[in-house]
């Protein structure tokens, strides 16, 4: 087709940018090529139709995207660790140095760089120190072993890139003319096996990257695993009316299945052709085309996952503001109702405040915040339990109405019931209007350029069931931006200070 078009064959057709079918003459005019149609010199026609130019050209485009998506997967794994309150030791230089694999060392170093100094990781460390038993000692595999998982895939993509780089700079026509020896060498440099094999390997690597993203995304939306984030990352006041990212997770499962299907090799399906002259042939263009399909699906997965991470970042911001509001309210109410008795004397219940605030610190905000005073939710149950425990310790004093902590429980709960819902709603309203008392921690992190790109440049926002916008509309904005290459600059900005080496072992 390309050779026919270049030589101006009247029956050759091209498709223009708008989808209109063009003749060769119209295509030349549209491309502003003012010269006549090409007159092919000896061997040039064969080079066009029988060489590896088209396959290697497609492979070059595919591998450019594959390299970008590989780096993006490393950075997204680091952001995943941030929002999941993971333990940063999984990136420790020594662990990966002892394994020797260069791809793994590189992946860990990139994640280590992103997480170094992260406000989220500092907060997570404090959380683990306060209550070491609040979450498992070790993070799950999708987080903890992400450098080991991505490492070999990076090496495969890099090897494939080098292979195609050699191919596009090589001679692949036939025969080759050795002028010095006056020989025509009938060889087979047109055989595109390096392309076919490289594309098969790349496609397998892309499928594995997609599988990791799906595993991480599934953890992110599951409130049994995500360390306090709401189920499906719902952000509405009433989570019962908000499906959140449930549809996105179903889509991710579908993407992952198709990506894994495409990982099947093409080069194992070679058929003999041309009366057994071409009894082996590379199928390089087929493999490159299928890898291009895989690239598109992985872009869909990457955009969905990054939108989920941005949602989680915003929910952590909301969580921090809501927790602060609840904590201040509980503190104020306990001071007013538990400090003194009816006659102004100091009351034994004044010692409860510290333990009451510990409950607020340890309880996941989104487990109760849609109805903070509900007796069926853990906050009120555990606050009451603190007062009951102190009352039991109070022993003999409980017999005196003036020193009884049991007598204070109803007063404390009634005042909290009056004030807490109003304070929570006020905090949420301030957050939604962009006037949150506590700023978003992401601005202090190296992953901020990606978040800023998604939220500010693309104009996306926190997804809630209260809005008319569907999640798919927001995902499409990011997917389109990734396809247009707009994500490259913010991605590289995240790594702008990285010198290509792991942090020193201290």
Curated annotation (Swiss-Prot):
Pathway stated in the Swiss-Prot or TrEMBL entry: Phenylpropanoid metabolism; trans-cinnamate biosynthesis; trans-cinnamate from L-phenylalanine: step 1/1
EC numbers: 4.3.1.24
GO CC annotation: cytoplasm
Key words of the record: Cytoplasm, Lyase, Phenylalanine catabolism, Phenylpropanoid metabolism
Organism superkingdom: Eukaryota
InterPro entries, A to Z: Aromatic_Lyase, Fumarase/histidase_N, L-Aspartase-like, Phe_NH3-lyase, Phe_NH3-lyase_shielding_dom_sf
Entry similarity comment: Belongs to the PAL/histidase family.
Name of this chain's protein: Phenylalanine ammonia-lyase class 1
Protein source organism: Phaseolus vulgaris
